[in-house]
């Protein structure tokens, strides 16, 4: 007798004339298919979308920067003329620069009574400060008004991603127009190195920062009020890394199989229970159930 390979078939077929369709089974089947479709589309959406995973570690991620950080500053001083506005930079490596002018622009506003300062400059990766003041002016104004609006203050490159909402421009929109005219403003910044790595392994380097601020009246050694807008910074040793990840294909297939198999199994159990209960009820009504 020849060997019958069909004996390995665990999915034995039942002739249609031996099966019995029911309205309940049809309803359960339709609901089952809709439920599977919903879960499948949800899982497919999650599979297509990229997941952002973040981690912390101690290191300098941008070692090729030469120990420098690019800074972008955009601030408006509506009551201080451009000819007396300047940027000073100093740090613990001995840098002390008064009236920095490279890559900076001063735009007169309010009929030249005010100024919008835009600057792009570099700082060393050591604690220090940069400040907007009148220190570089030849003739000091009698009552320098340091009320201001900060449009942008950012460090490093701007990340070209939409799915990260970090503190890359934490001071953007800071409005100090309601403060006192002769007050100095002190912003203390903690700069946090940040790395973004996409699916292809390409890395982008930037910096987030936290900020605390206070306002006070400062006097020179001659007793004059010398207000300024100070940005005192220090670097955090902790680096934040964001990594794009996508769910592996095998996990997606496993989940889809679990959805389909689990749903059909539960639906089959439910249909069998309802059918058995309805048949028992019919027998009771016919008086056949003892």
Curated annotation (Swiss-Prot):
One of its GO terms (cellular component) is endoplasmic reticulum membrane. This is Endoplasmic reticulum-Golgi intermediate compartment protein 1. Keywords: Endoplasmic reticulum, ER-Golgi transport, Glycoprotein, Golgi apparatus, Membrane, Transmembrane, Transmembrane helix, Transport. InterPro entries: Erv, Erv_C, Erv_N. Residues 1-26, 276-290 are cytoplasmic. The chain crosses the membrane at residues 27-47, 255-275. Belongs to the ERGIC family. Glycans are attached at residue 74. The gene is ergic1. One of its GO terms (biological process) is endoplasmic reticulum to Golgi vesicle-mediated transport. It is a multi-pass membrane protein. It is found in: Endoplasmic reticulum membrane; Endoplasmic reticulum-Golgi intermediate compartment membrane; Golgi apparatus membrane. Possible role in transport between endoplasmic reticulum and Golgi. The keyword RNA-binding does not apply. Residues 48-254 are lumenal. Pfam families: COPIIcoated_ERV (PF07970), ERGIC_N (PF13850).
């Amino acid at each position: 007798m020849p060997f019958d390979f069909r004996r390995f078939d665990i999915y034995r077929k039942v002739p249609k004339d031996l099966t019995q369709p029911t309205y309940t089974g049809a309803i359960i089947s339709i609901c089952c298919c809709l439920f599977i479709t919903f879960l499948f589309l949800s899982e497919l959406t999650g599979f297509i979308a990229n997941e952002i995973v973040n981690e912390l570690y101690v290191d300098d991620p941008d070692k090729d920067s030469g120990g420098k950080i690019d800074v972008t500053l955009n601030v408006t001083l509506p009551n201080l003329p451009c000819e007396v506005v300047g940027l000073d930079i100093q740090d613990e490596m001995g840098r002390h620069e008064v009236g920095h002018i490279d890559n900076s622009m001063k735009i007169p506003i309010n009929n030249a009574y005010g100024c919008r300062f835009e600057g792009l400059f570099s700082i060393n990766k050591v604690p220090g400060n940069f400040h907007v003041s009148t220190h570089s002016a030849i003739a000091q104004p009698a009552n320098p008004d340091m009320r201001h609006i900060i449009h942008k203050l950012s460090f490093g490159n701007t990340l070209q991603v939409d799915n990260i909402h970090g503190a890359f421009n934490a001071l953007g929109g800071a409005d100090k127009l309601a403060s006192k005219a002769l007050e100095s403003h002190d912003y203390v910044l903690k700069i946090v190195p940040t790395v973004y790595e996409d699916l292809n392994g390409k890395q982008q380097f930037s910096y987030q920062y936290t900020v605390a601020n206070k306002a006070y009246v400062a006097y020179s050694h001659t007793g004059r009020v010398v207000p300024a807008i100070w940005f005192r910074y220090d670097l955090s040793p902790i680096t934040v890394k964001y990594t794009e990840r996508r769910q592996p294909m095998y996990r997606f297939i496993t989940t889809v199989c679990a959805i389909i198999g689990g749903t059909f199994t539960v639906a089959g159990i439910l249909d069998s229970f309802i059918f058995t209960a309805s048949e028992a009820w019919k027998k009771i009504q016919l008086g056949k159930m003892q």
